[in-house]
Amino acid sequence: MRIDIVSIFPEFFGVLDISLLGRARQSGLIDLRVHDLRAFTHDRHRTVDDTPYGGGAGMVMRPEPWGEAMDEVLADDTDPVVIFPSPAGEVFTQAMAQELSAEPHLAFGCGRYEGIDQRVVDHTATRARVRLVSLGDYVLNGGEVAVMAMIEAIGRLVPGVVGNPASLVEESHSEGLLEHPSYTKPPEWRGLAVPDVLRSGNHAAIAAWRREQQLERTRRVRPDLLPE
């Protein structure tokens, strides 16, 4: 999978060189390309923003550097999905992560200030598949944190990135339910014991216990995930 990121803070994504995604990059499973938006400016101040038409607080990101950045990202004609993080977008879910993990090319545009000039989104949509995506009903300072979260969620679903694919099936949201509690050694710690069923060796009983724990936890914490 190829992933392009456009941001005024390219150094923000250095963390993607470590852990599972770092190894995925080294092995060629993920081709990550980070583009500095300011590299596409042509004034000595490397300006990427200006005051909004119609007035209002804050600044809006200018279309010219974004247009040139998108020209570079889209130059290979690979039909990517271009994602702009936005509180006005559709909510990111595990199902969306699964869907996007099957795409050969994703691109992310990290907005800042009061956002990106709408013409950038509109023009990009004539050249690629564009989606506005939100992490939830809150506002961040910029798109970088949201993009990091999405890449983490999507990248680990790319075949070969996670060593044991079975572990992905047991996680929260993989079946629309929250994950069951997990335990390891020692069998007792500070007066708290591991549930007997998990030490019984009875695989059917363990599976039933885990399923009930998933349902109970989902009913208590995220009842909206359960069918009506």
From Swiss-Prot:
Q: Name one GO cellular component term.
A: cytosol
Q: Name one GO molecular function term.
A: tRNA (guanine(37)-N1)-methyltransferase activity
**Which EC numbers characterise this protein's activity in its record?**
2.1.1.228
**Compartment(s) of residence:** Cytoplasm
Q: Which GO terms describe its biological process?
A: tRNA N1-guanine methylation
Ranked from the top, the taxonomy reads:
Bacteria, Bacillati, Actinomycetota, Actinomycetes, Micrococcales
Instruction: Tell me the subunit arrangement.
Output: Homodimer.
Summarize where S-adenosyl-L-methionine binds, as residue positions: G111, L135, G136, D137, Y138, V139, L140
Which organism is this entry from? Answer: Clavibacter michiganensis subsp. michiganensis (strain NCPPB 382)
Which domain of life, per UniProt?
Bacteria
Query: Mind listing the UniProt keywords for this protein, alphabetically?
Result: Cytoplasm, Methyltransferase, S-adenosyl-L-methionine, Transferase, tRNA processing
A Pfam family it matches: tRNA_m1G_MT
Note the CDD domains from the entry: TrmD-like (cd18080)
Family to which the UniProt record says this protein belongs: Belongs to the RNA methyltransferase TrmD family.
Q: What is this protein called?
A: tRNA (guanine-N(1)-)-methyltransferase
Catalytic reaction annotation: guanosine(37) in tRNA + S-adenosyl-L-methionine = N(1)-methylguanosine(37) in tRNA + S-adenosyl-L-homocysteine + H(+)
Q: Does the keyword Amino-acid biosynthesis apply?
A: no
Q: What does this protein do?
A: Specifically methylates guanosine-37 in various tRNAs.
